[in-house]
């Protein structure tokens, strides 16, 4: 009887191993890579998610917010495997021990543009043309600067720089966490929104009227870093590598962002 019991136990053990392997090999149970990211990267992650998951076996789980929110989450100890914030913010996160020194990678750069309903034409080639467009608009939408978004903070400065703060105040609409483009469209064809150009992409009922004039432009460089206590640092490394691949770079460029080159990764 003993040999039979041993054989039975061995078969049971082998079956259990097969079950465990199958469990963790299925897409529903793939290791997850949690990302805290600036919202400007949302359209990029939306388009690369399937390919990243297919080629690496990791499941991408992004969470979006303003740069200020991402920094607050990181400082507060929110668990994540990768943080994507601005180049201005990352050194402080490293200094405070929240991001591993040497893990930072510049991903892309974006600028600020004006969004309007599809079919609306605006000339924004000069500061004066932007001034006229702002004065003519029935509503102007941008991110609430108090929430820490780079675009919202800069737009408020631009309006002040143009000397239009009081004149425009009645028609300013601060979007508290909402999609700037969607809020703009909801206010009708005479409204315009000002936000990161990457956040205007993939909106069929909207169009980019143009970037801010160069004299008033602001560029944000997005940098990724691995948290000091990242649960899935290998997955974070895989995502960083994928973000520098030709496929990811093609998506980044399609969103109106400037990449920082390929590392020759997977095609």
Task: Tell where the protein language model's regions lie, with residue ranges.
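Bacterial N-terminal signal peptides
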Residues: 10-24
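Intrinsically disordered, low-complexity peptide-like regions
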Residues: 2-3, 69, 79
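N-terminal secretory signal peptides that target proteins for export/translocation
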Residues: 1-11
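Short N-terminal or domain-adjacent regulatory/targeting segments
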Residues: 2-3, 18-20, 121-124
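Exported/periplasmic ABC-transporter solute-binding proteins
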Residues: 30-76, 87-88, 92-96, 100, ...
């Amino acid at each position: 009887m003993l040999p039979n019991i041993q054989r039975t136990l061995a078969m049971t053990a082998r079956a259990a191993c097969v079950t465990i392997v199958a469990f963790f090999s299925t897409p529903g149970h793939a290791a997850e890579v949690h990302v805290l990211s600036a919202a400007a990267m949302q359209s990029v992650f939306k388009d690369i998610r399937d390919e990243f998951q297919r080629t690496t076996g990791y499941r991408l789980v992004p969470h979006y917010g303003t740069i200020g929110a991402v920094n607050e989450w990181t400082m507060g100890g929110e668990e994540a495997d990768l943080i994507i914030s601005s180049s201005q913010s990352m050194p402080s996160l490293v200094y405070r021990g929240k991001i591993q020194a040497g893990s930072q990678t510049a991903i892309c750069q974006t600028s600020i543009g004006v969004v309007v309903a599809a079919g609306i034409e605006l000339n924004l080639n000069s500061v004066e043309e932007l001034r006229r467009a702002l004065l003519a608009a029935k509503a102007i939408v941008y991110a609430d600067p108090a929430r820490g978004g780079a675009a919202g903070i800069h737009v408020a400065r631009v309006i002040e720089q143009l000397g239009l703060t009081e004149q425009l105040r009645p028609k300013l609409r601060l979007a508290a966490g909402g999609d700037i483009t969607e809020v703009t469209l909801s206010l009708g064809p005479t409204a315009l929104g000002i936000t990161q150009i990457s956040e205007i992409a993939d909106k069929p009922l909207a169009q980019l009227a143009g970037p801010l004039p160069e004299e008033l432009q602001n560029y944000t460089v997005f940098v990724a870093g691995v948290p000091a206590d990242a649960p899935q640092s290998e997955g974070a490394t895989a995502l960083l590598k994928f973000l520098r691949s030709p496929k990811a770079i093609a998506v980044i460029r399609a969103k109106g962002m400037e990449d920082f080159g390929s590392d020759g990764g997977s095609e």
